[in-house]
Every structure is written in C-alpha cells, then in structure tokens.
C-alpha cells in the first residue's frame, strides 16, 4: 500500500495567470489587487458558466465587450488613462461592471453622484421587478443576508447616493447597493453598473464554511443566494455582448441534475441495499452508495463491513451504481481528528468511537485512505467520492481528499453553502489556493422529519431549483424501506423525463471537464459565426446558450439546437461549430 504524502506544506496562492487565456470572448475581469478575493469571482463565473479571463492591463480588457473591474476603483488605484478608457468603452456601446467605486471620476457614468463607505451591512435586497422576464421566480432569490441573525457581524461595503436610475439592489437601510446606467450608440447599448458589495469575498467565505448563520435553514430548503449573484453577472454578460455564449449547468440541457445518494452507516442498512438498487436499476437510474467500512464494533454500532459485504458491493458495481466512501469510524469528531501519518492500513488501523464526542486511534488520513483501500479492493472500481459521517468537516478535508486520491466531495449542504450548484474547493477551506476537488452539496436529506411525508415539499423544492438548472442531491439512508423507498420511487417517477440522473462521480467528472472549458467566438463573415470550445478531456451533453438569432449549421456530429441552446455532441478536447445569422446582421 502506498504511503500518502500529507499536505502539510502550504502551497502557493493560485495565480491570476491560471485564468488567463488567449480568447477574448466573455467577460474581462480587470484585476486591480492580487490580494483581493478574486478567486471567488473566478469560481463563481465558472459555476454559472460565463466565459471570462483575468487580465491586469486595460489594453487586454478593452478587447472584450464586457469589463468587470475588481475589487475597487478609486482615483488612487486607477490611472487616469484607464478611467478614461473605461468611460469611452461604455459610451461606445459596451458594458462595465465596477466593484466598490469610490471616486475616480466615474460616478456619473455609473449613474450616481456620491458614495459612502459602510461597515454596517446586514442584508442585500434585489428589486424583484427590475428585470424583464422570469429572472426572479421566488422570494428566496431576491434577499441575501450579509450577517448572521445571532451574534451579527455586519459586513463592509459601499453605498451609492443621488441616482440617475432606480437601483437594482439596496441594503437593509434602503441605500443603493447596485446602480445602473445605459448609453445607446447606434444599434448598440452600453450598460454601466456599480456594485458596492464584494461578491468574491462573500462567495469564498460562505463556500469554505466560514460564515455560519446566514441561511434560514440547514437543509431541505431553497437558498439560492450565491446563485442570484452569479445569475446577475451572467445577465450582465448576456445583455452586454452580442456574441454572448454561456455554458449551461446541466448535462444535455435537462431542467436540473438529480443525484440519488445513499448513506450506509448502520447494521441493517446494508441488508436493504439490494432493494434500493433493484428499484434504481429497473428505472435505469445510477445511484451513489456512500458506504461506511465499519470493521470495528464500538459505541456507534456493531461491525457490518465483512467479507460477506463483497457480494453486495459487486452487485452494486455490476448494476452501474457508484460505491463511495463514508469513512471508517463515522465519527462526529472527524472534524477534530489529527491528520495522521499517511501510513494507516487495514487491519492495524483501529479507530474506536467511545461516544458522540470522543473517538480514539483515529485520523483523517486513516478514515480516507483505509476506507478507499477496502472499497477498491473489493470491487473493480476506483473510489473517487467521499461523504463524512454527520457531515463533520475538517478544515484540511479538501487537500486530504486530493492527497488520498479522491476527486469529489458531498460534505456540505446546499443551504449552508447558499448555492444549488457545485463548486471548486480551496486548500484548508481558505481563500487563496484552489484545488482539483469539487463539492456537490446535499439538497434533501431524510433525518429532519419523516421522508415519506415530505415528498410533495421535496418535489416543490426540486421544481424551484429546476427553474435555474441547479443540482438536487438527495440523501437517503437505507436503514428502512417502506416510506423512504416510496419517496424515492415517487421522486424518480416525477422527474425521470425532466432531470439528468447520474452518480456523484459521473456528474463530478462532467462538471470538472465543463469547468475546464474555454470558448472563442469568431466572425467568419457577416452571416456566420464560429464557436471553438476546448476542454481538458472528453465530455458529452455539454450545452451552450447562444444569441436567439443564431442557427446551428454544422461542425459536431450529434449536436442538436433547442431554441437558443445547442446541446453539443460528444467530443474530446476540442469542438468547433458554425452558426448562421439573419441577413440583417
């Protein structure tokens, strides 16, 4: 068994150059300060599917139709020629979204006259009627809490005053948080926005679980707060660029992604696995089984991971199910365990749970590497997904997952992370260094009220998430059948034709390849656009939203257009498609 090299040395900060490409399609993020929380902006734009590159020169930024300036604009941090170029950019019919604008000669351009720096921000509220169409479809999408209800710690920011147009969003005291202005030049309209609240810092703080108390509920509810911020940025991109292309968030342009996941962490749970798997196999639904490799009898339960488990695991594998790790000890103290040595092996690794608060002879490395070794040894698979018992979350989990060979985590709830989309994780859940680990948060679980009594509210929740193409990750323990099995049967029947169902690993792989995608839009002639997409690996069902008057012509076998969405056929590394435009273009 290989020794795990523990990630005890802090890696270097992720460089903005990681997000620089030669493509000038999408948004230019003009970075003013490398020490800012720009990684939150980058991860957010990746999640929502908006193409972008990070630049540090105004010359490169001006190659784009839409420029996002982050984290601040002041008279002292922005050169006069840059300020002038940004103003001319907007007055020429292109778009600008600027964060924390304090002076610099741009207030009137952005639609306000004065600013106020604040440290008392408690809430951000979007005007639900400010955008046409169905941008806001639920009250939960319009209000974002910026401070916990208990022990509030208000956030800093900027408010804008004496506005030219109604604000897009306001703070709890009624002052403007996001302003808007526009300039029409010929057939082009340039839009200018000032944002007084740091999206990047908020995203990183919440998704790294360092901002507790913001959500109304822990799980089983609709909390799309980060998603609203990201959809706003996507709208700015779409409105500001005539060639806007966006990567959609679900495979094959389905309404949402549905993941059926099971936690097997109780003696009787493994006995019920074949019944759940039979239901899923009969519906051609692959599910993920997070299995505790419990080979020690302790306070929690008797051991149940034995040689007899192999037949069950092999049957799951043969039916197309994913087998994932749910740790060895299933201890709530996982979050407080030592890293370990990286040499932990079965059977000498013997973690013992004394009670809910106490576990001995356990380590994070042991929980990860020993459970993975056992699952890999008993099946013909490589275990790549992990979920901790009790969703106990060590700060070091992301880098320890990477060190022990995992790729995907399902360790947090969608409500606690304020998003119904996957996201990339950072080293030690901090703000500076990204890792190749993706979190797919849990949406619905079965411990807070009888699951069988919650099918209607769960369907309603899934429909809300479907409005914007999110992920519904359902956690069902297999400790009983009856109402839980019936819940799953009804959930699958309700959404089988509308959602894309897959395993955590299947969706995680699709999402990771999508995350690597870079798009370049080229003008072939007055009536033809070429879209070139490159990825790190093979992908099927990647979907792109294009301008409504584009018609797919040719380029990739198996591609199908559905209104303004092109579902791309399977490809590896590179795809090229051509669109025709109306003669008037």
Which residue ranges define each predicted feature?
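Catalytic beta-strand/loop cores that center a nucleophilic Ser/Cys/Thr
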Residues: 40, 125-205
